[in-house]
Amino acid sequence: MSIIIDALPSAYEYDGRVYDMQTDFKEWMKFELLLTDTDIPINDKSRRLLELVFPQIPPDENLWDFILWFYQCGKEGARASKKAKSQKQTAIYSFEYDDGYIYAAFREIYNINLITVPYLHWWEFKSMFRALHDCKIVDIMGYRSEEISRDTPEYHKKFLTEMKRVYALPKSLTEQQKLAELKKIRESLNL
């Protein structure tokens, strides 16, 4: 599926019936925040996630496969390289804690006011978010993700260590952990 060629999904079809769904980026930001909330029991979380996405919940046992697909913008998770798998995974952004930086980046680069924009599809938002460049949030995500190795020059180690401290997120889930949480919810409901 291509977001440029194909119509962006806005509903779920099951058993000949079309179920409208929330597709605006703000609702899916809420979805991600709820997904990463470790204080909510999984059954309560799954119900609340469904209620957030669907005004009327489809009775399909495969619904979570669709939700996972939609959350990933119609793409399967990229296969991580062996090197990436062996590296310690760190969350590099948080919609809750980086909201100001994300807002500023969209204003600066795309001239989009994320506060007042009436609607922006989740897939459009995520595409633009991934393509951000030359802005503070990209620098911050770079600091958070860059690994400090033995080969890193001492001056850069000190700088990176300080930037990691300054821009540290409270315990946040990585992208892989978010997908794993969604899969765990899906599996718990398919008992």
Residue locations for each model-derived region?
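Short, surface-exposed, low-complexity cationic segments
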Residues: 25-42
